[in-house]
Amino acid sequence: FHAGLRQSEDILDHCTQEGIGFIPWFPLGNRALVAPDGPLAHIAARHDCTPAQVALAWLLQRSPVVLPIPGTGSLAHLRENCDAALVTLDPEAMAELQTAPEMA
């Protein structure tokens, strides 16, 4: 479950209703989703962050029960992932991500 593949919306909605933690599989999606010139790049530019931070911020704002566990290969990447919690996506970005065509 990530911004490019939202097939578990009904499960997430149920978890949110019941207060059950939801750990999305592969929260950053594929490389194309979070590439510097990928589909999240324009949202990242508007919010002064990276596409990966947009993907994680969307998950964190989507529901308070979402617990993304992104992988990391370096300290810089870990910081980038953690800083996603500081990104607040505007309502337009949230709506765009919620209705964007899916990409596995």
Listing of model-derived features with the role each one plays in the protein:
Residues 1-104:
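Beta/alpha (TIM)-barrel catalytic core signal, keyed to glycine-rich beta->alpha loops juxtaposed to Asp/Glu
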